[in-house]
A protein has these predicted regions:
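Non-catalytic linker/capping segments at the edges of enzyme domains
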Residues: 1-37, 42
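A generic structural micro-feature
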Residues: 16, 50, 75-77, 92, ...
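A generic structural signal for short beta-strands and their flanking turns/coil linkers
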Residues: 20-22, 32-34, 77-83, 94, ...
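Hot-dog-fold acyl-thioester-processing enzymes
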Residues: 42-65
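Hydrophobic beta-strand-centered segment that forms part of the acyl-chain substrate-binding groove
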Residues: 67-97, 102
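Beta-rich strand-turn-strand
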Residues: 88-113, 117-122
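Single conserved hydrophobic/aromatic residue that forms the stacking wall/gate
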Residues: 120-131
């Protein structure tokens, strides 16, 4: 299974624009769930030194799409038509865990959930909290 998913990751890295940026690595798959390690390099940061929100959305879009593509055996390439995001706190340059989960799959529409978290906690939340 890991080898099969890594074929899709390699295709995404070689043919996709954002696939070249995030450098995804496989962590875990089970039906309806995918976990990857990705990286936010320096060119994804905003002037404040945190990951630009659109880059976070792009990584979420990628991991959710890759799950659906894999489960459809590569027969579909989905469009994200209604992507909502909530940014609870900033992310910083470095490795992140990206997860995707299928909530409900219909004939033409899939509801999914994606989450991101950094692999480390530096800088400390105290460094960016406003008092």
């Amino acid at each position: 299974m890991k080898e099969e998913i890594e074929k899709y990751l390699a295709f995404h890295k070689n043919k996709g624009g954002s696939g070249k940026i995030f450098n995804f690595k496989f962590i875990e798959y089970r039906e309806g769930f995918l976990k990857l390690k990705g990286s936010f390099p320096a060119n994804t940061l905003n002037p404040a030194g945190t990951v630009q929100g659109g880059q976070m959305n792009s990584m979420l879009d990628d991991v959710t799409s890759l799950l659906l593509i894999y489960e459809a055996d590569g027969t579909i390439y989905p469009n994200s038509t209604n992507l909502h995001s909530i940014h609870h706190r900033p992310l910083f340059e470095g490795d992140a865990i990206a997860t995707a989960e299928i909530i409900k799959k219909g004939k033409n529409i899939v509801n999914m959930r994606g989450e991101l978290c950094l692999l480390y906690t530096s800088p400390s939340p105290r460094d960016w909290m406003v008092s």
